[in-house]
From Swiss-Prot:
SUPFAM superfamilies recorded: Acyl-CoA N-acyltransferases (Nat), Protein kinase-like (PK-like)
GO molecular function: aminoglycoside phosphotransferase activity; ATP binding; N-acyltransferase activity
Protein name according to UniProt: Bifunctional AAC/APH
Key word Acyltransferase present: yes
InterPro entries: Acyl_CoA_acyltransferase, Aminoglycoside_PTrfase, GNAT_dom, Kinase-like_dom_sf
Domain N-acetyltransferase: from-to ranges: 8-180
GO terms under biological process: response to antibiotic
Family: In the C-terminal section; belongs to the aminoglycoside phosphotransferase family.
EC number: 2.3.1.-, 2.7.1.190
List of catalytic residues: D374
The organism of origin for this protein: Staphylococcus aureus
Keyword field contains Kinase: yes
CDD domains for the chain: APH_ChoK_like (cd05120)
Pfam families named in the record: Acetyltransf_8 (PF13523), APH (PF01636)
Amino acid sequence: MNIVENEICIRTLIDDDFPLMLKWLTDERVLEFYGGRDKKYTLESLKKHYTEPWEDEVFRVIIEYNNVPIGYGQIYKMYDELYTDYHYPKTDEIVYGMDQFIGEPNYWSKGIGTRYIKLIFEFLKKERNANAVILDPHKNNPRAIRAYQKSGFRIIEDLPEHELHEGKKEDCYLMEYRYDDNATNVKAMKYLIEHYFDNFKVDSIEIIGSGYDSVAYLVNNEYIFKTKFSTNKKKGYAKEKAIYNFLNTNLETNVKIPNIEYSYISDELSILGYKEIKGTFLTPEIYSTMSEEEQNLLKRDIASFLRQMHGLDYTDISECTIDNKQNVLEEYILLRETIYNDLTDIEKDYIESFMERLNATTVFEGKKCLCHNDFSCNHLLLDGNNRLTGIIDFGDSGIIDEYCDFIYLLEDSEEEIGTNFGEDILRMYGNIDIEKAKEYQDIVEEYYPIETIVYGIKNIKQEFIENGRKEIYKRTYKD
């Protein structure tokens, strides 16, 4: 093996490396985490150990940084005995295990291990078509665990008394990196649920939906568990939980909303769990099959729910206020401070034209109230009689412009029912300026490509930046 990227080189272990390996593996700072300080290697015993035959394919490598050897790694294809040892089910998938150490303490905590692991991921996918990679760090080695998590590994199981280390059986984690669904790894989510919620046993789990920064799972065919992994995960789920609690206390309606039974909220991880609300999600296709009477009853259900929610005294959750216009102004500043100068004249013209419209409009000066703020068909559940029975996903909710809950109801698209549907609901809702609601919807729609670019900047996702820029061109030349 010979992989070179910038300062890092990963090459095959050779005989000339063993004196340096002996130096590393007689350093107690290294042995504390790799091998154990009770190991007493000689050059001969070290050579024997690190050249012994392997059951299947193995790569033994030296890690170099700026041409200086600083560590060792081994990557091996899993075989029967290892599957049993790791408690990892054997399937037709191609799975590799790995372990490694940085033998020069001066190079610890510099991100080199993380970069090394990502290069190995790339190699195993490209050269071996691997499906997954696993490893089993000691639980008492938090520095290594953090590095593995930064690389993409996720904890999927506890391995109690798994590895003999300095005369004691050490507890370990089984960590996995998957090439197909790593961000949504159901085994990792199963582990998190059982780890953070005592006495909750996961018998079945499946992904039922995902957004830009969150994933939802159906667990035991009864509960919905959501996890958020963006930079605002703690604030986002704390707010969402508070709003669910507020609504369940104050709303007087037969329409169900999530009632949080399980929550874990921290800077590192946030999870919410609630019993699934049964029903069928509203779609344009379902709506088109309904009788006129059923359609009108559904529109009245929606208007009634929104009118009641928008009329609640929100004093107790006033900290959940969202200023859409101010947010856009701040995002414009972020654009100016980051990639604005790299944009084309067409892209800049689109942005500046939008900002002129934003500063001229009065639609942001209307009523503020508690809104869902993502009130679209795929969040509305119907019962067997096509009546509104449930509303989910209040993750974007807050005290905001009244018009925002009509954005999707007024939208003409494959996912939404159309402008006439939204206008009918607005008329049933009453005491609202329908033309201003439509203007608000149009402004939000015009902002969409800019919002996409900003999301990419905030979350360091280049594909969103590129998609937003492409959308500006599509809209500019649509005629």
